[in-house]
Amino acid sequence: MKIGIIGGTGPAGSGLALRLNVAGYDVVIGSRDKARSIEKVKELQALWPTHNLTITGGDNGDAVNCDLVVVATPWDSTATIVGEFASQLAGKIVVTMANALVKVGKEFQPLVPPRGSIAAHVQAEIPLSKVVAALQHLPAKELGNLNHHVDSDVLICSDHPEAIETVSDIVERIPGCRPLNTGRLSNALALEAFTAVMLQMNVRYKTRVAPRMTGLPDIDPISGRNLKI
């Protein structure tokens, strides 16, 4: 499977590209400026020379032509950018990892978009795509450090069960990550808003927190997925 990352030159996008490529996926980093994405790939390859990275740099058009697409742009441009590629994204799984947040004084606070979440707005812009909300809570700095062991549950929601399964399979290949199905896309409001809580804890406790749910069975009774980690 080839995975494209729109806006993949930022910390979250490039960190995710690293993890996915090391996990065995072909990855294309997209950007409005193709030269910038090519430079980012060279930077990653120089930083991690022993991992034989095969990430490709391209523009956002190259990213949307992949089998599955992740949108890693700032939240206020996510829906607009995917809307530009609505026809190319038709029928594809599109993962949004955006959070609508604002900093008020020293605190992060969630913003509630008119449609309830960034993910819902994206689904409205590309109605023929299978939009999935996921990856909002993975710390970008840790993702981009291959010497750091990621230790996090990844909460996933979508109106398309088969898309949740596909994204879960991908997440499961990142060591330390456990995918959890959190239901329909309407729950993206809660996933996105919870990021503000996590960031506030980071500030207060001078650390980087990640979600880890307890009380789950070893096996998901619906999908049969092994929930052990």
Annotated model-derived regions:
Residues 1-43:
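NAD(P)+-binding Rossmann beta1-loop-alpha1 motif at the extreme N-terminus of oxidoreductases
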Residues 47-56, 127-130, 177:
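A short helix-to-beta-strand connector/capping loop
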Residues 48-93, 100-106:
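Rossmann-like NAD(P)-binding element
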Residues 94, 98-116, 133:
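Conserved Rossmann-fold NAD(P)-dependent oxidoreductase catalytic core, especially the SDR/UDP-sugar
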Residues 107-115, 145-162:
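Short beta-strand and adjoining strand-loop segment in the mid-core
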Residues 114-135:
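Rossmann-fold dehydrogenase core element
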Residues 152-229:
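Active-site-lining helix/loop region of Rossmann-like oxidoreductase modules
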